[in-house]
């Protein structure tokens, strides 16, 4: 509750879902998500038939200074990490599949100038992480990550499936650091 109130005061544009959001079950998540003054986005958890149906979107499109920004979220595999009764009815989709589908929609159908992934997959961990996600996907420009509690002093730049640069950043844990990423875009979108 305190976190959402602070996020509201800080005027967050969007947030995604981490494994700890499931710690107290779906009813608690729904209550907290209703308090959020910003959208909750996650493209690879599907909530049809649960109390979270309609509270979580796959993505949101923001307009900032004439730049159209598509923002979507991804969550980690819950099985083995969260008690199964705490995510009953939630369907998990492979993050790479979900990311490619949504990023393509944002870039090619919605014509977003910039596509940002809010990832809770982690960095340099066993299993699918942000490094593997980037190398297997297209159309993502920035990955703002979490889960592994990694702190980057400067963004890491990785190559996507097309050999294009993707900027990745993480700010550790417990709100110890606040990140700021300044982007310059040319009129052609470069």
What are these regions (language model features)?
Residues 1-190:
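Acidic, metal/ion-coordinating pockets
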């Amino acid at each position: 509750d305190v976190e959402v109130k602070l996020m509201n005061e800080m005027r967050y544009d969007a947030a995604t879902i981490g494994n700890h959001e499931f710690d107290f079950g779906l009813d608690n998540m729904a209550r907290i998500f209703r308090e959020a003054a910003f959208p909750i986005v996650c493209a690879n958890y599907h909530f049809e038939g649960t109390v979270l149906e309609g509270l979580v979107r796959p993505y949101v499109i923001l307009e900032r200074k004439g730049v159209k920004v598509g923002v979507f979220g991804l969550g980690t595999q819950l099985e083995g990490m969260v008690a199964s009764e705490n995510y009953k009815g939630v369907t998990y989709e492979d993050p790479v599949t979900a990311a490619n589908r949504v990023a393509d929609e944002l870039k090619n159908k919605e014509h977003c100038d910039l596509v940002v992934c809010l990832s809770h997959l982690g960095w340099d961990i066993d299993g699918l992480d942000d490094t593997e996600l980037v190398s297997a996907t297209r159309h993502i420009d920035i990955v703002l990550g979490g889960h592994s509690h990694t702190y980057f002093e400067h963004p890491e730049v990785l190559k996507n499936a097309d050999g294009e640069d993707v900027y990745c950043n993480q700010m550790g844990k417990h709100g110890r650091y606040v990140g700021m990423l300044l982007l310059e875009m040319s009129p052609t979108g470069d």
